[in-house]
Amino acid sequence: MNSNSTIGRTTLGESDTISLSFSEPSSSLNSRSTDVVFASTSTLVPQQGSLTSLPPVSSTATPTYYSTSLTYDETLHTSIDVSSTSTLVSSTDSSSSSEQDTYSSQYDPATSSYSIITPSMSIFSSTSPMSSSSSITSEWSSLTSTTPTLSSSATSLSSSWSSLSSPSSLLVSSSLSLSLSSSYSDTKLFSFDSRSSIFSPSTPTVISPSYTYLSSISATSFQISTTSELSSSWFSTISSPSTTSNKDTTFPSSSRNTSTSFYSSSLSSTNDFSTISKSSKLSPSASSSTVSISTISVPTSSSVSSSSSKVPSNRPSSSSSSDDTTSAYSSTYTFQSLQSTTSSSIPPTTQTPSTSTISTSPIPTSSQVFNTVAISSSEDSKTIYYFYTQTYDITDSSTTFVTGLPTTIAVAKSEVTSFSAPSSTITADMSFYQHWLDGSLDNNKNQGTSKTNTGTIVGSVVGSVGGILICVLVVWFMLVRKRKAKRHFKENDSFCHEIGRRTGFPTTAQAKEASLQAQDSGSQQRNTETASANNPFSNEFNFKARGNPPPVPPPRNVTAMNGSFQNMRSNFMDQENRFSYGSSFTYSSLGSSTQGGFSTLSSNSIRLGRGLDNDISHDERNTVQNNSQGFLREII
């Protein structure tokens, strides 16, 4: 019989401050954190006819690691201030006669701030991909009978990864400010030589970093190789002491873990480095952490929780209990991994052994394959209704399961003689399944969709034909209008209509009409004669209406003109060939036509120009031909 008693209750306030500073030129090797990308697939198969059945979980995860290494040889003056404050609010101790003590404490939110100032720094960085592949397989089997039976399960986990990076160059400017704030409670249970701890954060941790770097780097390299192996096995014995449905199951188990880490780095440094630091170390048994992840999906529910602690214990334990309807088991694996030290010019930090505890709660298998489809029918005067179960593959981002949903199809009697249900599986999303559960899924939406599609097709065809006709009419109208415009331009703007207009008189066609009207009546003839005095083109083709030629003018006295004419002839004879018309009408022809005292045309032939007449010698003619050219030579 155990008796419990409370020892005491205390309220303490604790404050811890860490400060690091150095201001000498330094050279160091830096490695950034690793980014991990997981690609996982899980499958849930529910039981037919039940939306809350418990299907098995099969999960495969393939993570990919991307590591960025920073290597730099820096010459800088850096100051680092680190402060951390934690306050113990309450503490309670209790003990029992079975030599078991319970200790619990609660802390208020703790805040840690880091400030790093680096005036000048050059960074050569390179990114090297690291690949990792891990597989977790969970097997579960059970057999229930009145005699003792055996149920076994095995879980194995293995992973390995390696990395090799090479430097590259990068020049950036940054500064770093990091703040961490969280509030947590701590509960401890310990007895004799074992101790466990659970750390549950009540508020999320807030980290706000900002970087400013300006550095100069030398090339370095490092290599990481890690091999991890986890194996476990256990056996169970099931006993049925009575005919009742409850059963007790105990799983003794053993686990084994092997972890190997290798880390090597090299760097070159030519500067001295000094560090003045003050730090506080928390023992491995003083804190622990628990991370819980809960996943709920329709129509099944499952929960997975994992916890990690720093308790250096390697004694696993497991227990299980089951009844007729549900079964679950819980296993705890404890393994310890050691990390190797770092080789660099910076003093290495203290490596703390870490221990991880994984707790899983899988659910029993439940699978159903829809091989046979039962069809029932109902009919009225015109329609036959078929009822059957359609297989659906419901797929979501985190869940995939197969289920059967009742489906109804209405077919006219005149269109079908026999009916067979489709055997293929239809793939749908979770929203479809949710609508089916809510009763808001319209089974006749396909018929409405077909009618809508028919109307859309008819409207598209009619619109296309109408659009083509409208385009043809517009093109025809433009062509007709252009043809009329060309015809109007030919009638009004042709060359024949411009002949009379350029002299200020009507066109030739109007003159023809006027001459014909003048021949019909005397009055019109008089009007035409009056108009002909002003318009020389009015009687152009009326030869009968033309009058007699004008009388010959009286003769002129040319005696006094002979002297002046000879002078004028001699003065202008040299310039007679300046123009082309001088060769066809010369003063010699003018003189011959005016010697008789009349101004009429002479009967002599036209003079060809000086040097071409018959009254000059052959030598003079050649000389004149060489000095000037006449009208005929110009034409040739």
From Swiss-Prot:
Residues 1-33, 87-109, 238-271, 299-326, 339-362, 510-551 are annotated as: Disordered. It is found in: Vacuole membrane. The modification Phosphoserine is found at S628. Keywords: Glycoprotein, Isopeptide bond, Membrane, Phosphoprotein, Transmembrane, Transmembrane helix, Ubl conjugation, Vacuole. There is a cross-link at K512 (Glycyl lysine isopeptide (Lys-Gly) (interchain with G-Cter in ubiquitin)). The chain crosses the membrane at residues 457-477. Its main location: membrane. It comes from the Eukaryota. Residues 1-18, 510-541 have a biased composition (Polar residues). It is a single-pass membrane protein. Glycans are attached at N4, N257, N492, N557, N562, N626. Residues 19-33, 87-108 have a biased composition (Low complexity). One of its GO terms (cellular component) is vacuolar membrane. Belongs to the TDA7 family. This is Topoisomerase I damage affected protein 7. The lineage of its organism: Eukaryota, Fungi, Dikarya, Ascomycota, Saccharomycotina.
